[in-house]
Amino acid sequence: MKLNKIEIKNFKCFENESIILHPKLNILMGNNGTGKTSLLEAFRILIGSLYLAFDKYKEKIEMPGIVKDDIRLKTVSKSLEPQIPTNVSANAVVDEVFLPTPEQPYQLFDNNEITWLRSMETFGGKTTTRDAKEMFAVSKKIQEAVRNGDEVNIPLVAYFSTDRYKKERRDTDISKAGSRMRGYFNALDTTTNTKFFLDLYYTETLDEIQNNVAS
């Protein structure tokens, strides 16, 4: 899956912004306070929509949403007022194996493209998912493929916030026979979980040695 374009409205410091992405590599450059981290947080919400239909494992696979601190503030008559709705939307190319089937009740774009939008329409309200039906269908396809044991490549997701180096998340519960979806545990969390990674690596390596099968 590759993101082609994102659009954000009333998100953090951005009133209305549209960004076209390079298919290979994208680098954000700018002075402090120009919105680089804000853009990454918008990406985090959009990519998190991939989790819409995933099985939830003790809140380790969490779908981030728009929060009150994400809403752009504007000076109006000498006061700061939140500007809503706050929207983040994206267009992406999806591997054909994960595309929704033709009988789905919505229209796919051409060239294996999907689009989705997340929004906060009232201050402090919930982040909407009604305009993310295409991504929900892709998410469902991925979960079904994993559940059925299909040999398919699924998207790699990793988010590294500027706070990860100083915030350590403490939880365990890594089992040898865990789901393949463990690879998504805490992937979009703003904290670091070194122990989780080491435990996961240990159990997968041990299983590979003992059973002589690729992990």
Question: Where is each model-derived feature located?
Answer:
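P-loop NTPase switch/coupling surface
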Residues: 1-202, 214
